[in-house]
Amino acid sequence: PGETPPQAFRTPVHCAEMSDDGLVYDCDRPSNRISIFQRDGTFVSEHIIAPATLSQGSTWDLDFSPDEAQTWMYLADGQNMKVYVIRRETMEVVYSFGDGGRQPGLFFAVHSIAVDSDGNIYTTETYEGKRIQKFTFMGMAEVSGNTGAPWPADRRRGGD
């Protein structure tokens, strides 16, 4: 942490996803870095996520929101046990959800992430997590920071 990221990937790339506008996003997990390239391999930019993360890094897998502009990127971070919601145009982390644990909405090494056409988010966990979770899209709202576990549902609605 705190050092200039290497010019090359530290290990084999852990994820590579193409957005609808033809940009390729990759996860350089141990460098806590998402690199963006054109289809022809031309470098566009790189972005460090959770720079103080040690060990296995913060960038495990990513996917995009289903809207036409793919406004949002969802990033699985197995080391810090959360999902980041990132504004794709600026690569700003808007908020995150999750924490370490085995209850619904918590993660034990969230490893993979996918978003369906309705905006529902699916995550898988590795090591001893060994499960899939579905986070149902319920609309847009202003949030920031780490919202913690999106569970139980009755807490979100004020207990009704």
Where is each model-derived feature located?
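Eukaryotic scaffold repeat domains enriched in small/polar residues
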Residues: 1-160
